[in-house]
UniProtKB/Swiss-Prot annotation:
Residues 18-183 form a propeptide. Binds 1 zinc ion per subunit. This is Neutral protease 2 homolog MEP4. Zn(2+) binds at H311, H315, D326. Keywords: Cleavage on pair of basic residues, Disulfide bond, Hydrolase, Metal-binding, Metalloprotease, Protease, Secreted, Signal, Virulence, Zinc, Zymogen. It is found in: Secreted. One of its GO terms (biological process) is proteolysis. PANTHER family: NEUTRAL PROTEASE 2 (PTHR37016:SF7), PTHR37016. Pfam families: Peptidase_M35. It catalyses: Preferential cleavage of bonds with hydrophobic residues in P1'. Also 3-Asn-|-Gln-4 and 8-Gly-|-Ser-9 bonds in insulin B chain. Residues 1-17 form the signal peptide. The gene is MEP4. Its cofactor is Zn(2+). The active site is at E312.
Length: 412
């Protein structure tokens, strides 16, 4: 009887907990424009202009305005996208300093000049097309808290590359790899004993998160899946589940898999928590990763060490191809991505899987609670009241597949 009442309450609330109305970011947004121009053999200048009528602050990180050798542009040769050989950095999005934003009044612009040979092998030379397309994360002009996002697509820049000159460009990834090869020859050899112990445990919890994500993508709530990935057909669900299973297979091996982990890197600066080098299947765990986040978090949609490691694993193209990109961070932003970006966005996978795995009721973890009929949980904080006293709190996203099972297989 008590369990039946719980299900009734949750069913009534669930329609608002997993809204279909989370607005996707339109690719036709015109408030921000990006213009690319060639300023040397492989040097490109990007000019970002505020075309709107209000001041905005554009996040430079993981964008065409970033000085870090991230995926600022895509390069195409003979109609085929060339392999990205740069780095992807995971940033702390909750404690961003002022200098990682470009504040633009209406009509103002910011620019960045970079060498595309840093992140793409152009030694063969010849004609290529350069394009930047993606998302700018935005803050209000008086804040450093992310409050929205805007889609953009640049012009297509044609360049005839001199391969001999391009081959002389030292790629940031290549320089980093040589330094790592001097120091790192096996799993976690640059980590302290405490960090090694922590990461070994985190690989186990990452396996659990990935397993939960795979189960949910295969048999879970269609409504929840659609909130994150925008489509619910098998052509969408199967690759999502397959990526999770591939990650689970990798992280369960611990020290015998494809991916190598290190705790030492000269790029670990500022807000960077971790760095993914998909080209050589290398993940760097930066010092702030251990100090800024708990191993797991009971807060709904919160970032924790396990979700960061899962996020980084989705970038690894040798684990599951293609590796993901970093279009957006955080629940509010990833759920606004269109379908083609959502299925290739690392944080979409991380948040979806984390929400499917870990929550509390009477401080009982999901693997135990999911086997007990009647222990069904909700998307946000939900105190259960008995005789005026709080007897438990759900603090992680509701496992909707469990609710669906108790509702006789009906989708929310």
């Amino acid at each position: 009887m008590f369990a039946t009442a719980i299900v009734a309450v949750l069913l009534a609330a669930a329609s608002s907990a997993f809204p279909h109305a989370a607005r996707e970011a339109s690719k036709d947004d015109a408030n921000v424009s990006v213009q690319l121009s060639a300023v040397g053999n492989t040097m490109v200048k990007a000019v970002v202009t505020n075309r709107g009528d209000e001041a905005i602050s554009v996040l430079r990180l993981n964008s065409v305005l970033d000085s870090f050798p991230c995926r600022r542009v895509d390069v195409y040769k003979e109609g085929k996208k060339m392999e990205f050989e740069g780095l992807l950095a995971h940033h702390d999005m909750q404690n961003l300093p002022d200098d990682v934003f470009a504040t633009l009044n209406p009509g103002d612009f910011a620019e960045n000049t970079f060498d595309i040979a840093e992140t793409v092998d152009l030694s063969a030379g010849g004609p290529v097309t350069v394009l930047s397309e993606g998302v700018f994360l935005l803050a209000r002009s008086d804040s450093t808290s992310i409050s929205g996002m805007v889609q953009y697509r640049s012009n297509e820049l044609k360049i005839d590359v001199d391969g001999v000159l391009a081959a002389k460009v030292e790629s940031a990834g290549g320089l980093r790899r040589r330094n790592l090869d001097k120091r790192t020859s096996f799993y976690l050899d640059t980590c302290t004993p405490a960090a090694m112990k922590n990461l070994t445990a985190l690989l186990k919890s990452t396996t659990d998160y990935a397993d939960a994500g795979a189960r949910a993508a295969t048999n879970g709530s269609l409504a929840t899946f659609e909130t994150f990935f925008k489509k619910t057909d098998l052509r969408t669900r199967r690759p999502v589940a397959s990526r999770f299973r591939a990650i689970s297979n990798e992280t369960s091996i611990i020290d015998g898999g494809i991916v190598r982990l290190t705790c030492s890197d000269d790029f670990c600066k500022g807000t960077i928590n971790a760095i993914a080098d998909s080209w050589i299947s290398f993940i760097t765990i930066c010092p702030r990763f251990f100090s800024a986040y708990p191993p797991t978090s009971p807060e709904c949609h919160a970032t924790d060490q396990t979700s960061i490691l899962l996020h980084e694993m989705t970038h690894m193209r040798h684990v599951y191809s293609p590796g993901t990109n970093d279009f957006a961070y955080g629940y509010d932003n990833v759920t606004k991505l269109p379908a083609d970006q959502a299925i290739n966005n690392a944080d979409t996978f991380a948040i979806y899987a984390a929400g499917k795995f870990f929550f509390f009721w009477f401080f009982v973890p999901y693997p135990i609670a999911s086997s007990i009929p009647g222990l069904i949980y909700f998307h946000r904080f939900l105190p259960w009241m008995l005789n005026g006293k709080v007897i438990g709190t759900c603090r992680r996203c509701m496992p909707t597949s469990l609710l669906r099972r108790h509702l006789g297989g009906k989708s929310l």
